[in-house]
Structures are given as C-alpha cells and as structure tokens.
C-alpha cells in the first residue's frame, strides 16, 4: 500500500548528509541519528505541528429544533377514545345499558383505551369481523343478573358473514359451521328429542341466560387468531371475574385448552365443566360431551329453571 509520502514530488525527497559535532562547530557529545529520505510537510501558519483536537459530537438538539410528540396520546385515533365517557362507548359499540355495572370501570382502564385504539387502526388497514356494532352483541340478550351458563369460545369466525358477536353462533341463512354441528350432536345425544336446527343462530340460548362469549372479540378476515394480542382476553377475563363475584351458581362450559387456561372460576361457588374443543380437528369426539345435561341437572338442583336447548 502506498503511503502519503509516495505521492509527493521528487523535490520533496532530500538527502541530508551525516555530520559530526566538529563539522557543526559544536562540542556536544550527543549522537545524532541518521535521517533518511523524509516527507517534509511544513505546518500552516499559526500551527505548532501538533494534531488538531478531536471534534466532539454535539449533544441535544440544534437551537430552534423541536421534536414532534408521536406518543399514543396525540394520535388522532387515540384522542377520542381517551376522552370518551361511558355513554360515548356504549353508543359507539351498541352495548346494552344493563351491562354498565360490569363494564364501565373496566372500559375506562388505560389498557382498554389502547385496545380500542389499536382496533381502530386495524380497521383502517384490514377487514375486521364482526362489525363494530356487534362486538358486544353478547350483552344484548340477557342482563348480567340473568346469566346462568357461560360458554367460552376462542375468537370469532373469520369468514365473511359469519361472526355476529355470539360465540359459536352464525346468523340465519349462513351455513352452520362444523364446530356448531358437533355442538348440536352433543345436545342430541343428551336429549334424543332434540332436532338439528336448519340454522346456527343461537339467539334462543342467549335469551335464556347463556352467555356465549369469545376470549378475543375481533378477528381479521381469513386470519384466525390475528387479534389475539390486542388485549380483548384481558377485558373478557375481567367481565367473567366480575360475574363470578356478583353471581352464585354459574355453570361454565370450557371447551379446549384455550378456554380452560383463560378462565378459572371458583369451583366452590360455580360448576366448572371442561371438555375438548368442538372443532372437527379436535382429538376428542365432542358428540360425547355431556355438559348440556350436567348443566341442567345443576340448575335444577340449585332451584333454577333448566335451559331449553332446542332451537327453532
């Protein structure tokens, strides 16, 4: 590799003859070293030849420069949610007023505000099910004090036209999903007189106090589990915990590992039934699930009316 001196002109290379003290007219006995060809660089006027001091990186912002705050609180989609009253949220999401004692305090928590804002951001970039007005449809069929049975699902159906806010349910005119067909088969095994409905709308169950709720309340089209990290599970868990403390003798049907991990009612105060998931992909034959019979036996034993599982 070439050095800087290699690029100097030949005039820059001089031979300095070795001299002795006598030749210099000096009596000094200090030996001199031999100086070979050198690259002679004259310092600039005012310089001493020492290396220049290192430039330090400036700290802070230049004068007159200010950063724009991009935190959550200043995002236009966040501002509305953070300032919304319960009435605003109730109206926007079509929540039944009877659920205010269960939901109001939780809906004002910071994590719910972030959750709803993230939901709005997702809606701006992808198709989300169910429609916003149906996310809390599970509140509109029975007030909290009338809930007797809680069936916990995972997340909504992800195909167009299926999800409408009730776990495992689809509206009339929509083909009955395989999981719901297996649920119907389990009911029929416990109640031979049960007739398989031609539709999958579970409204009649919900009106009798069967809470059909998913742990995740929204999903992106064609992407099951895509909204599992938004925070819905925390809100649903709070709702279930609140129901457990305000009611006695609830029946919980927890199907599959996900439901069983996300919900842990006090077994001393409530009946907790567990089984495999009704999905056809489950290793367990859901047709043998006895929960519908066991739930009614428990309700009757505790002096309450059993659920009529027949759907017209």
From Swiss-Prot:
Location of the region described as Disordered in the Swiss-Prot/TrEMBL record: 1-61
GO CC terms: host cell nucleus
Annotated SMART domains: UDG, UreE_C
PROSITE patterns recorded: U_DNA_GLYCOSYLASE
Membrane-traversing stretches: none
Keywords: DNA damage, DNA repair, Host nucleus, Hydrolase
Locations listed in the record: Host nucleus
Active site residues of this protein: 155
Catalytic activity: Hydrolyzes single-stranded DNA or mismatched double-stranded DNA and polynucleotides, releasing free uracil
Enzyme class: hydrolase
Molecular function terms, GO-annotated: uracil DNA N-glycosylase activity
Keyword Amino-acid biosynthesis: no
Amino acid composition bias (Polar residues), ranges on this chain: 22-33
One biological process term in Gene Ontology: base-excision repair, AP site formation via deaminated base removal
Superkingdom of source: Viruses
Listed EC numbers: 3.2.2.27
Compositional bias segments (type: Basic and acidic residues): 1-11
Protein family according to the UniProt entry: Belongs to the uracil-DNA glycosylase (UDG) superfamily. UNG family.
Function statement: Excises uracil residues from the DNA which can arise as a result of misincorporation of dUMP residues by DNA polymerase or deamination of cytosines. Therefore may reduce deleterious uracil incorporation into the viral genome, particularly in terminally differentiated cells which lack DNA repair enzymes.
Protein name: Uracil-DNA glycosylase
Source lineage: Viruses, Duplodnaviria, Heunggongvirae, Peploviricota, Herviviricetes
